[in-house]
Curated annotation (Swiss-Prot):
InterPro entries attached to this UniProt entry: Ribosomal_bS16 (IPR000307), Ribosomal_bS16_CS (IPR020592), Ribosomal_bS16_dom_sf (IPR023803)
Lineage of origin: Bacteria, Bacillati, Actinomycetota, Actinomycetes, Bifidobacteriales
Cited Pfam families: Ribosomal_S16
Family: Belongs to the bacterial ribosomal protein bS16 family.
Annotated NCBIfam families: PRK14520.1, S16
Protein name as it appears in the record: Small ribosomal subunit protein bS16
SUPFAM superfamilies recorded: Ribosomal protein S16
Length: 149
Protein backbone atom coordinates (compact mmCIF):
# COMPACT_ATOMS: atom_id res chain seq x y z
CA UNK A 1 0.00 0.00 0.00
CA UNK A 2 1.43 3.37 -1.07
CA UNK A 3 1.09 5.77 1.85
CA UNK A 4 1.38 9.52 1.83
CA UNK A 5 1.82 12.08 4.57
CA UNK A 6 -0.54 14.88 3.63
CA UNK A 7 -2.87 17.58 4.89
CA UNK A 8 -6.53 16.98 5.72
CA UNK A 9 -8.59 20.18 5.54
CA UNK A 10 -10.70 21.14 8.56
CA UNK A 11 -12.46 24.29 9.73
CA UNK A 12 -14.91 26.58 8.00
CA UNK A 13 -14.86 28.53 4.76
CA UNK A 14 -12.04 31.06 4.54
CA UNK A 15 -10.65 29.89 7.89
CA UNK A 16 -9.13 26.52 7.18
CA UNK A 17 -6.74 24.62 9.39
CA UNK A 18 -5.23 21.26 8.62
CA UNK A 19 -4.39 17.95 10.19
CA UNK A 20 -1.19 16.22 9.13
CA UNK A 21 -2.28 12.65 8.42
CA UNK A 22 -1.05 9.36 7.00
CA UNK A 23 -3.33 8.16 4.18
CA UNK A 24 -3.41 5.65 1.39
CA UNK A 25 -2.41 7.63 -1.70
CA UNK A 26 -5.67 6.71 -3.48
CA UNK A 27 -8.09 8.09 -0.86
CA UNK A 28 -9.91 11.44 -1.05
CA UNK A 29 -8.33 14.54 0.46
CA UNK A 30 -10.62 14.51 3.48
CA UNK A 31 -11.17 10.76 3.56
CA UNK A 32 -10.37 8.27 6.29
CA UNK A 33 -6.83 8.57 7.61
CA UNK A 34 -4.61 5.74 8.82
CA UNK A 35 -3.11 7.95 11.52
CA UNK A 36 -3.13 11.60 12.51
CA UNK A 37 0.34 12.86 13.43
CA UNK A 38 -0.14 16.60 13.81
CA UNK A 39 -1.89 19.87 13.03
CA UNK A 40 -1.14 23.01 11.03
CA UNK A 41 -2.98 26.31 11.49
CA UNK A 42 -1.90 29.00 8.99
CA UNK A 43 -4.34 31.55 10.45
CA UNK A 44 -2.30 32.39 13.56
CA UNK A 45 0.74 34.66 13.66
CA UNK A 46 3.17 32.90 13.39
CA UNK A 47 1.52 29.80 11.92
CA UNK A 48 0.97 27.00 14.44
CA UNK A 49 2.67 23.72 13.56
CA UNK A 50 2.38 20.70 15.88
CA UNK A 51 3.82 17.46 14.53
CA UNK A 52 4.57 14.33 16.56
CA UNK A 53 8.22 13.91 15.57
CA UNK A 54 8.47 10.29 16.68
CA UNK A 55 5.52 9.19 14.52
CA UNK A 56 6.70 11.29 11.55
CA UNK A 57 10.12 9.60 11.74
CA UNK A 58 8.46 6.18 11.87
CA UNK A 59 6.27 6.80 8.82
CA UNK A 60 9.12 8.32 6.83
CA UNK A 61 11.20 5.27 7.77
CA UNK A 62 8.62 2.81 6.45
CA UNK A 63 8.35 4.66 3.13
CA UNK A 64 5.49 7.15 3.42
CA UNK A 65 5.98 9.98 0.93
CA UNK A 66 5.22 13.53 2.14
CA UNK A 67 3.44 15.95 -0.18
CA UNK A 68 5.21 19.22 -1.02
CA UNK A 69 3.27 21.16 1.61
CA UNK A 70 3.97 18.58 4.31
CA UNK A 71 7.61 18.39 3.24
CA UNK A 72 7.89 22.14 3.87
CA UNK A 73 6.31 21.71 7.31
CA UNK A 74 8.68 18.84 8.13
CA UNK A 75 11.64 21.03 7.12
CA UNK A 76 10.40 23.84 9.37
CA UNK A 77 10.06 21.51 12.36
CA UNK A 78 13.41 19.84 11.59
CA UNK A 79 11.95 16.35 11.15
CA UNK A 80 13.04 16.08 7.50
CA UNK A 81 16.65 17.02 8.31
CA UNK A 82 16.62 14.50 11.16
CA UNK A 83 15.28 11.79 8.82
CA UNK A 84 17.87 12.55 6.12
CA UNK A 85 20.71 13.00 8.62
CA UNK A 86 21.41 16.58 7.55
CA UNK A 87 22.72 19.50 9.59
CA UNK A 88 20.16 21.90 11.02
CA UNK A 89 17.97 19.23 12.61
CA UNK A 90 16.58 21.85 15.00
CA UNK A 91 14.53 23.35 12.16
CA UNK A 92 13.39 26.93 11.70
CA UNK A 93 10.17 26.82 13.71
CA UNK A 94 9.33 30.24 15.18
CA UNK A 95 7.45 30.34 18.43
CA UNK A 96 5.50 33.12 20.05
CA UNK A 97 7.21 34.53 23.11
CA UNK A 98 5.04 33.83 26.10
CA UNK A 99 3.98 37.11 27.63
CA UNK A 100 3.65 37.58 31.35
CA UNK A 101 0.90 35.42 32.78
CA UNK A 102 -2.30 36.91 34.13
CA UNK A 103 -1.18 36.84 37.77
CA UNK A 104 2.00 38.76 36.97
CA UNK A 105 0.02 41.37 35.02
CA UNK A 106 -2.42 41.78 37.93
CA UNK A 107 0.47 42.20 40.37
CA UNK A 108 2.09 44.80 38.11
CA UNK A 109 -1.15 46.79 37.88
CA UNK A 110 -1.66 46.61 41.66
CA UNK A 111 1.92 47.75 42.28
CA UNK A 112 1.41 50.68 39.94
CA UNK A 113 -1.84 51.58 41.71
CA UNK A 114 -0.04 51.49 45.09
CA UNK A 115 2.66 53.81 43.73
CA UNK A 116 0.02 56.24 42.48
CA UNK A 117 -1.80 56.15 45.84
CA UNK A 118 1.47 56.78 47.69
CA UNK A 119 2.35 59.67 45.37
CA UNK A 120 -1.12 61.18 45.79
CA UNK A 121 -1.05 60.91 49.59
CA UNK A 122 2.46 62.39 49.60
CA UNK A 123 1.28 65.30 47.47
CA UNK A 124 -1.75 65.81 49.75
CA UNK A 125 0.47 65.78 52.86
CA UNK A 126 2.87 68.24 51.25
CA UNK A 127 0.00 70.56 50.26
CA UNK A 128 -1.44 70.35 53.79
CA UNK A 129 1.97 71.14 55.31
CA UNK A 130 2.39 74.12 52.99
CA UNK A 131 -1.09 75.37 53.90
CA UNK A 132 -0.27 75.08 57.63
CA UNK A 133 3.05 76.84 57.10
CA UNK A 134 1.32 79.64 55.22
CA UNK A 135 -1.31 79.91 57.98
CA UNK A 136 1.36 80.13 60.71
CA UNK A 137 3.22 82.80 58.77
CA UNK A 138 0.06 84.87 58.42
CA UNK A 139 -0.93 84.45 62.08
CA UNK A 140 2.21 86.10 63.58
CA UNK A 141 1.87 88.98 61.15
CA UNK A 142 -1.65 89.64 62.41
CA UNK A 143 -0.70 89.45 66.12
CA UNK A 144 1.72 92.40 66.09
CA UNK A 145 -0.89 94.46 64.33
CA UNK A 146 -3.37 93.52 67.04
CA UNK A 147 -0.90 94.53 69.79
CA UNK A 148 -0.38 97.95 68.23
CA UNK A 149 -4.01 98.84 68.73
Amino acid sequence: MATKIRLKRMGKKFYAFYRVVIMDSRTKRDGRAIEEIGTYNPNTQPSTININSERAQYWLGVGAQPTEQVLNLLKITGDWQKFKGLDGAEGTLKTVEAGPDAAARVEAVEAQAQKLKAAKSEADAKAKAEAEAAATEEAPAEEPAAEAE
